[in-house]
């Protein structure tokens, strides 16, 4: 009923928009939280990580490793990202390298289009496969406000997940 009423099959999107508005996050904070959410696909865990490490540019890798190890058993990841659990430091390292010591927004301005961002994320961000990349880009579009419109639903991708095709068939 929630999804039909709000025309959203992913309630965390609504909640992220509420939190961004309520706490008046700036664009860099939104981008950082969107990436954390992309690694976990579990908004409570993403929010906890963000509260511990609120500034992307100030995250110390050794502290992140220690914190991740200390909190491993308590952190929850969504089923689709369960194999990311425990790899937050490595994922962060790849994200930091990808951003390349500049504002996060500059990276997206440089890449410009959905397809360019998609290809770059898949290639450069550790443990971001098709599914993680899709909902990460969805979050960037729907919550952060980046103009990332997919050029395809990836229905021709027979080598990976079938859930997006099955879901579309069910919806039709």
Task: Place the predicted regions along the sequence by residue.
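Helix-hairpin-helix/helix-loop-helix acidic hairpins
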Residues: 76-126
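Accessory, usually C-terminal, subdomains that scaffold auxiliary metal cofactors
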Residues: 138-172
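Generic structural signal for hydrophobic core residues of well-folded globular domains
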Residues: 34-42, 121, 125, 140-141, ...
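Short acidic alpha-helix initiation/capping motifs at coil-to-helix transition points
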Residues: 4-14, 110-117, 158-161
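Structure-specific DNA junction-binding interface
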Residues: 1-88, 142
